[in-house]
Amino acid sequence: MSDLWEAQREALGAFIREQRKRANLSLRQLAEMTSLSNPYLSQIERGLHQPSVRVLKALSDALNLSAETLLA
């Protein structure tokens, strides 16, 4: 079961990184836009942390995505 959660965290992180790059934002810029720390956002992108719903909402707003897109 933990392998499944790990794979989901990694896939979500990779998707967030891809969307950030498509928006031409640096990690620091996205961190500032979402009031997240740069290291925490980096850990999310690397699949080391599962973000809360509040964090996903902040990321979706900053990246102009629907929250449902990040949760799918």
What residue ranges belong to the model's regions?
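Residues that mark the N-terminal boundary/hinge immediately upstream of a DNA-recognition element
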Residues: 15, 26, 52-55, 66
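Short basic helix-loop element that most often maps to the first helix and adjoining turn
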Residues: 14-31
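Conserved amphipathic alpha-helical interaction elements at protein-protein interfaces in regulatory
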Residues: 18, 22, 50, 62-65
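Residues within helix-turn-helix
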Residues: 28, 39, 68
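Recognition helix of helix-turn-helix/homeodomain-like DNA-binding domains
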Residues: 35-50
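A detector for short, charged/polar N-terminal pre-domain segments
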Residues: 1-11
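DNA major-groove recognition helix of helix-turn-helix/homeodomain DNA-binding modules
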Residues: 35, 54-69
